[in-house]
């Protein structure tokens, strides 16, 4: 279970503080205060999605229940939020990874991640323009204070854990008990023909559970010189699909 433990140590604290920050922004009315100075009708949702896609999804769900957005508006706003969260992933995961990959390989990785992320923005803009959505969301709700922020943080965090933790535990357990050897029997010859190490399957299989876990394992394998930068880059793209 050492592999799972390493993933949890790297990912779970980041996930928790991201959700906590998003809830603090909502419950302490930080978004409403900032909205007075930043005149953009999408800003509150963008701000929440930037720190946590989980909290952003919960926010949209609550706004839908309250009737502040319609079901027609939900999808383009969600795509807009996922574009912003994609920028978060690039800033806090892709770019730090790229520094260890080198300027050439790392630059290609970040560029492709950015271009893929831009698809969310393009889809959102086209839907908003074509259907002439008129979305104007402003946070005027009464603040629930620090208690409300902490309460919702743990509520959302444990919901994520119910899927994240079992997935990582199952995948890493199977890897540590021979799954990789079985997979290598089928794909090893092909990967060797491509001058790739079968070890990249560790990253790819982890990506089936969580791409964040795949990035964490990739950085560890790169630090220990088990995989080359090109192999890490290739495996991360496979894991992303």
From Swiss-Prot:
Keywords: Cell membrane, Membrane, Transmembrane, Transmembrane helix
InterPro entries (UniProt xref): MJ0871-like
Record's GO cellular component terms: plasma membrane
Keyword Glycoprotein: no
Protein name: Uncharacterized protein MJ1589
TM region(s), chain numbering: 1-21, 43-63, 75-95, 108-128, 160-180, 200-220
Family in the record: To M.jannaschii MJ0871, MJ0880 and MJ1556.
Lineage of the species this protein comes from: Archaea, Methanobacteriati, Methanobacteriota, Methanomada group, Methanococci
Membrane disposition: Multi-pass membrane protein
Compartments where located: Cell membrane
């Amino acid at each position: 279970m050492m592999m799972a433990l390493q993933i949890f140590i790297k990912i779970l604290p980041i996930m928790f503080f991201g959700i906590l920050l998003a809830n603090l922004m909502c419950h302490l009315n930080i978004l409403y205060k900032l909205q007075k100075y930043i005149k953009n009708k999408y800003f509150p949702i963008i701000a929440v999605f930037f720190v946590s896609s989980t909290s952003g999804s919960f926010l949209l769900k609550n706004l839908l229940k309250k009737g502040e957005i319609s079901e027609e508006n939900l999808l383009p706003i969600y795509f807009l939020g996922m574009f912003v969260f994609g920028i978060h992933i690039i800033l806090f995961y892709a770019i730090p990874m790229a520094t260890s990959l080198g300027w050439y390989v790392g630059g290609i990785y970040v560029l492709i991640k950015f271009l893929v992320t831009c698809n969310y923005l393009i889809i959102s803009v086209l839907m908003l323009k074509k259907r002439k959505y008129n979305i104007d969301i402003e946070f005027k709700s009464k603040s629930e204070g620090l208690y409300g922020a902490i309460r919702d943080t743990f509520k959302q965090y444990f919901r994520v854990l119910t899927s994240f933790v079992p997935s990582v535990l199952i995948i890493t357990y199977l890897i540590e008990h021979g799954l990789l050897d079985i997979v290598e029997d089928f794909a090893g010859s092909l990967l060797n023909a491509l001058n790739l190490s079968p070890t990249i399957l560790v990253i790819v299989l982890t990506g089936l559970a969580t791409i964040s876990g795949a990035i964490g394992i990739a950085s560890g394998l790169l630090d220990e010189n088990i995989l080359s930068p090109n192999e890490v880059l290739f495996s991360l793209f496979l894991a992303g699909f």
